[in-house]
A protein has these predicted regions:
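Beta-propeller domains with acidic blade repeats across secreted/periplasmic ectodomains
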Residues: 1-197
Length: 197
């Protein structure tokens, strides 16, 4: 909170604590306000507590994290994004890992656990090809620790749903993903495919 108008926060509060420190790509981050008024963050494992309700501890496995700013209610969310978190014009949230350029949520954990007979084991899925099935055409020689990664996404990040209209109607429903190792940005057109995208 800026109390004296100098555009610098004078009051800082920790809202949540307990996230497990790990590699940079496995840190809580990339907050995005969803159309449902929850704030979504990538990858928040740990034993999480809230400063507003310190008696409530939630153990979050290797998943994304979300909270309601008004009540500070918080919970695990489907997905395990790393560097990138975006919401398209229809409210679909997309995120990525280094080898999975565009992922989204099919069902939230709370919905899946209500039915003990559910055959769905994870609530997120790849919107397009992932891992060794992706193809990128870099402008430079891509260096990788694994030969099988050549010509594929190895460091996907910054997933962004294009919401503007400046580029023209052909860019509606486009999702861009950075691939820094190959010095390029990939573009995918996301469209409904039955119950999924």
């Amino acid at each position: 909170k800026d109390t004296n108008g100098d555009h610098v926060a004078d009051v800082r509060k920790t809202l949540f604590d307990g996230f497990t420190p790990a590699h940079p790509q496995m840190q809580i981050g990339n907050p995005r306000w969803g159309l449902d008024n929850w704030i979504y963050l990538n990858y928040g494992p740990g034993k999480i507590t809230s400063s507003r309700n310190p008696d409530n501890t939630v153990t979050i496995p290797r998943r994304d994290f979300r909270f309601l700013p008004e009540t500070m209610k918080f919970e695990a969310d489907s997905g395990m994004g790393q560097f990138g978190n975006t919401v398209d014009r229809w409210g679909h949230r997309f995120y990525c890992t280094n080898r999975n350029p565009i992922m989204t949520t099919l069902m939230r954990p709370a919905v899946m656990t209500r039915n003990p007979y559910s055959v769905i084991s994870r609530g997120h899925y790849d919107v397009g090809k992932s891992g060794g099935e992706t193809r990128v055409y870099p402008r430079v020689e891509m260096k990788s620790n694994y030969l099988s990664h050549a010509g594929t996404h190895t460091s996907a990040c910054g997933v962004t749903a294009y919401l503007g209209d400046l580029l023209g109607p052909e860019y509606v429903n486009s999702v861009f993903v950075c691939e820094p190792i190959g010095h390029l940005v990939t573009r995918s057109i996301v469209a409904p495919d039955g119950l999924t995208l």
